[in-house]
Every structure is written in structure tokens, then in C-alpha cells.
Design a protein with these regions (language model features):
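Membrane-proximal helix-loop-helix units in multi-pass membrane proteins
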Residues: 83-150
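Terminal transmembrane helical module of multi-pass membrane proteins
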Residues: 149-205
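N-terminal topogenic module of multi-pass integral membrane proteins
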Residues: 1-76
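Membrane-interfacial loop-to-transmembrane alpha-helix junctions, especially the N-terminal start
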Residues: 37-52, 107-114, 152-160
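Lipid-exposed faces of alpha-helical membrane segments in multi-pass integral membrane proteins
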Residues: 17, 21-24, 48-62, 91, ...
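Juxtamembrane "helix-exit" motif on the non-cytosolic side of transmembrane helices
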Residues: 30-34, 62-70, 104, 123-129, ...
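Aromatic-anchored segments of alpha-helical transmembrane domains
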Residues: 55-58, 116-126, 161-172
Length: 205
């Protein structure tokens, strides 16, 4: 392992947080079942989205372990490529697609959008052609859809977490200071909290 004990005490808990934070949607779905039944297409399949989001974090942790938790420009956890890194991105995409489908899957456009993104992402990743574009598209679509359904401006804070993720990831690559590794992971995984808040605020005021 290439990081010291002090840095480990920061980075490891953040990755555990990233692995578990999707579970925050579970009580939101269960406790607000009647409300969601009136607002979304099929709330029960959100559980499957949670599973895929957690799987994505698991693959990321696995890749980080292989990289000895030290992210650089050349490492697969950085700007490099690997099977595990690809599975991480793909699992996040599928999880996001499932959530979007759960919200407005009654629209044929959404079915085709999700299908196309799921099919083309592995190719784009392998060919190194805008590999994060599918994630960007589905992320924006989910945020806007959640706002239209729940009417809570707090959901737009997801865009802030994305911006901070990009900023801290670039700092990590430029400096190789692994403190930014923790910050990148923290903000990359925290957007789902604002979806939870949007559901809770809309359902309970």
C-alpha cells in the first residue's frame, strides 16, 4: 500500500461511505410508498438501481486496492483503463438508468435512451471515445426528471457535487496528493443524498 496510515484513515472511510450511501434510498422508498406510487412509474425497481450503484462502488474499491490506493494519471483509478474501472462506470450507468426508468419508464423515449446508453458505453470506454458522456447524459436526465416530479430545488445540488468531483479529481491528477482522492470520492458519491432529500421534502414537507 502506497499511502500512509494517516491518509488511509481518511480514504478508507470515505470509500465505505460511497459503498453504502445508495442505501439511503431504501427507507425513502419504503416510507413514502403511497406518495411515490402516485408520482413515479414503478418505484419498486429503484431497489435494483441501488444494487447496481453499490456494485459500482465495489468495483471502484477493488480497482483502488489493485492500485494500492494511490491514484495517478496512469493508474486505472485515474485516467487509465481496466476491466474493473469499466465495470465501475458501467454499473453506475445501469443504476442511474434503472432509477430514471423507475421515474418515467412509461415514456418510450426513456426506454430507448437507456438501452442505447447501456449498449454504447462499453464500446465508448473500450475505444476511449468520450467514455464519460453516457454517464453525463443519464445524470443530467435524472436530475431534471427528479425536479419535474418532486419540484424540489435541492436536487440541483447534484450539479454542484459533479462540479466539485471534477475539480478535485483534476487536482488529484495534477498533484498526486491523495487527500483529493478522498474528496473526489466523497463528492462523486454524495449526489444521491439530494435525491433522497427531494423525495422526503416532496412527500413530507
Amino acid at each position: 500500500m502506497k499511502i500512509d496510515a494517516k491518509m488511509s484513515a481518511w480514504i478508507f472511510p470515505v470509500h465505505i461511505y460511497a459503498l453504502l450511501v445508495p442505501l439511503i434510498l431504501v427507507p425513502a422508498i419504503i416510507q413514502n410508498e403511497s406518495f411515490l406510487n402516485e408520482r413515479v412509474f414503478q418505484q419498486d425497481i429503484i431497489f435494483y438501481g441501488v444494487i447496481f450503484l453499490m456494485a459500482g462502488s465495489f468495483f471502484e474499491v477493488w480497482q483502488n486496492h489493485i492500485d494500492e490506493w494511490y491514484v495517478t494519471d496512469d493508474s486505472a483509478s485515474g485516467n487509465g483503463y481496466s476491466l474493473l474501472d469499466g465495470l465501475f462506470s458501467f454499473s453506475i450507468l445501469v443504476g442511474q438508468c434503472i432509477i430514471l426508468y423507475a421515474f418515467i419508464g412509461n415514456l418510450s423515449l426513456i426506454k430507448y435512451l437507456c438501452l442505447i446508453l447501456i449498449l454504447v458505453m462499453p464500446i465508448m470506454y473500450y475505444k476511449k471515445i468520450l467514455p464519460f458522456l453516457p454517464l453525463t447524459i443519464i445524470g443530467v436526465a435524472n436530475t431534471i426528471t427528479a425536479y419535474l416530479i418532486f419540484g424540489q430545488e435541492v436536487i440541483f445540488l447534484q450539479f454542484l457535487t459533479i462540479a466539485l468531483t471534477v475539480i478535485f479529481f483534476n487536482k488529484l491528477i495534477q498533484t498526486e496528493n491523495q487527500f483529493y482522492h478522498g474528496l473526489t470520492t466523497l463528492f462523486a458519491s454524495s449526489g444521491i443524498i439530494f435525491l433522497y432529500l427531494a423525495i422526503e421534502l416532496a412527500a413530507n414537507g
